[in-house]
Amino acid sequence: SVLSFKKADSTFPKLALSFFLISTSLPTIANSSIMGRKYFVKSNLFDKLDNKKFDIIVSNPPYSIKWAGDDNAVLINDPRYSPAGVLAPKSKADFAFIMHSLSWLATNGTASIVCFPGILYRGGAEQKIRKYLIDNNFVDCIIQLPDNLFFGTSIATCIMVLKKSKKDNSILFIDAIKECVKVTNNNKLTDENIENIVKTFTDRKDIDYVSKLVSNKEIGENDYNLSVSTYVEKEDTREKIDIDVLNKEIDEIVKRESVLREEIKKIISEIEV
C-alpha cells in the first residue's frame, strides 16, 4: 500500500499510473490532504479511508506554514496530531504533517517525509514531539540533503524516515550534502547519488564524514537534537601544516637573512673606504 500526501493532485495521477504500468496486481494507493477529505483508490474504485494503514508513505509538505493548532479543540483531541501530548506550533505546522503520516503508517511500513531543518533542533513543542518520536523508537533515519535541490527554495532540506517496527534502538544520520551535481543555479540528485544514499541507508553503519548510527539514549541526553551536523563530523578540508617542517623553513629563512645582512654590511664598508 502506498500513500502520498499532497494538497495539489498533480503528483498522485503519475504515481498511480506508474503502478498500473509496472504491476499486474495494483497495491492500495492513496492521495490525502492534511486538511481535506481522505480517499484511497484500489483499481478504479474510490472508497473513503477508514482505518486503512499504508506500507509506504511519501510526503513533501510545505515548510513551516501556519495552522490552527491548539486553537482548534477538534485538533487537540485528534489522535493523528495529539499522541505527543502537544500539537505542532501554530506558526509551524511541520510536525503536524509528520504526525499525520505516522498515524497512517502500517506496523511494518516506512514513511519518508521531506522536512525543514529547523524542526530537528528547535525547542518547545517541537522538542516534545521529537522526544515522543524518539522514545517510542519511530525515527529510523535522518538524511541531510544538499541545498538548492527543490524548485522555489534554496534551503538544504532533510528527509525523516519513520518506522514502527525497527530492529534496533538507534537512529542513522546521513550527511548527503555532497551527493549532487550542479545544474545551472540548482543542484540535482543523479541516479548515482541516489544509489549512494540508499546504500548508506541500507548498510546502516558508521562511515567517516558520511553517516553515524546513534543510540536513542545518546540523542535523548543531547536534548533530543536530530540535526545531522550534531552527530556526523565534517571533514576538515583545510590544508594541514606540518609544524616541524614549517619551523625548519623559518630557520632557513632566518639563516639566509643573517648571511644577507653580513654581505650588505661588507658592501657598505667597502663603499665607505
Question: Predicted segments — roles?
Answer:
Residues 1-39:
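Low-acidity, Ser/Thr- and Arg-rich intrinsically disordered low-complexity segments
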Residues 40-44:
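Short acidic loop-to-helix transition motifs that present clustered carboxylates
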Residues 45-273:
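A conserved structural/catalytic subdomain of Rossmann-like adenosyl-cofactor enzymes
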